[in-house]
């Protein structure tokens, strides 16, 4: 019955794609997985107390307190609504607003602690100045604004008790949203807001990343309902801001050179500058009261009268919008407006500098969070007082457990055959891979001129020796002598090498097993080109190595590369002892397939690109260590995975079904000779607002794929969403050595499934990894659908165990292995996008824009992986 219900919902979802009301009705029928009985919690692992960056929120009168919501309309709309509302409050608080101090969300909602003396009213606001921009205030083009306030709803704070009772509804969520707006009112007026966080050069030390970029300190705050009641989550953060420098200096930094007077920009430079400047705000030098939004970069004469001598006439102009008009400004007369966050992708050097600033050890982050709370002075916040909100200024202590690490099995020929990792780490010393792969034919190509021929040969020899020592079969001699090639000739070099190799191997009925590729340290797009050609054109498994590692000859690096090569060649590095002995929770009793899914979206500034979905699935049982991966392309920022299940009408074969889920189920059957009776689907990266839609679409696709494999085939499905807790931190008890490691971080395996979790849903926080830098960030697992009726403790144990099965390293990782592989594969798939022609200045790839909607998957712009690689873990 449940399967039929899900199938119906899936069909209805597609037929009602454009009917919002009926779609909401369908979503309301979903019943998310409930929290298992308390008796199942706290049974596994060592109990301990940790602290989290949450602060208790108290309301003066929860039972009879009401918040009033009003719709806001500001006319004309010129982008300064907050300034207009602040002026309205200043002018009308004691008269027209009845003494109320409202909180405004910056868009359409305004909240008050009591009723205003009207249901609907229009105010005329004369805006003489803008507090945070006095220079702009003196030159306002529009001074008179009409603000219309209209009563919308009464929000009873009593409904917040429904969160504690495990029955949240629309009213309780509205109350939570209103309180969040109230507490953000003061920081919004004080600081620069970006992506939900507040930044200021005065909140901490500003670090210069380069001549035009600097990092600002900031903080994030959000009120949330937990089992402990209302909590204010506060975390410190860092972000990159652009200095208010001349645009020509900004452009010169982008190009990493000074702009020459008579040198026009080439097409590549033009596109790079265009991408960087689009969307920014600029001002004219010496005329700071006007701010212009950059729409485009064009080769057109200036259309704005400026009294400047033009030094660089060959440079393009900025196309900007100004009070409904389009004008063109020369680059050299403009400067970057102050307080703009750098939203484009950072290069490796700038990213490393930012990470150095952002990484704070636990005790330092703990201190900075408390300092932020003290600096915000919530007890003196007039809006908090108005609404009767009080904040405790100490971190909340919560219950946690430290889950045990799993025993790992290695090959019996090694000195150590079983090993229990300590603090989430181990190594391959005195151990051998449990199943060694075979590399009987290999070759090496060197694209780095600084790596001499003898150094490259020695590296390949040492790498082969390490592979053999670790348990692999690795041929001593390559098929061909070392090939030296130029980075600019990557495609011809790889094709020629492959042709020469196959001339030797084809008569023997063999193929090239592995290609070792030596790359320069700063190789730009070379890595992506190598992977694209090898995996979508030739059908080769490759292992890329940077020159700095080749020249160092570090045995730990060689051991790490050997692990990756073994996984790519179909071997296993290690296996869980519990899996071999049929003791792995929720896997031992029935054939189980474990999925990992991830969608990667384009970087900011590349809106014309598409999103890429990757789905990997285990191909062995009960070991759950080998995975196969599939990819699909979909519309830009489309969150739900569109390629899970497809129905096609074939004129010859009739209606056929396909999709990534069905293909994985069939490959699992071919590998194990069994149909999986249980499906565990770990879905990475779905935002909270998209959870119902993702569940409806993707769970329906899974059910439909299973139904297409036979009328009686209905495996039990557990659908788990994994979210990166960007702002939830856990701090150890520094006085209890059993709760932290040598870096003062909480120990690997720390799990929290109470206190700060949701009252009625099946969720938990898990820190499965060891961190050597900064403060650990736990991962949040939310079981949305559970037909297997898992117990909380045993499912947490399984999830923790899966973090020890990654083939790419000898330590537990921060997410379950299938999700880690899905992330690697989706990132790799970015390399498969067809190169964009230079003459096309409208986008950065040949993929369709968002306006093309789902047609993106029909364009074929994502090059397909060669069939001989689909069953291999080539993406490691």
Curated annotation (Swiss-Prot):
Keywords: RNA-mediated gene silencing
CDD domains in alphabetical order: PAZ_argonaute_like, Piwi_ago-like
GO MF, any single term: RNA endonuclease activity
Domain Piwi: 514-834
PANTHER family: EUKARYOTIC TRANSLATION INITIATION FACTOR 2C
Role according to the record: Probably involved in the RNA silencing pathway. May bind to short RNAs such as microRNAs (miRNAs) or short interfering RNAs (siRNAs), and represses the translation of mRNAs which are complementary to them.
Protein name stated in the entry: Protein argonaute 17
Highest classification ranks of the organism: Eukaryota, Viridiplantae, Streptophyta, Embryophyta, Tracheophyta
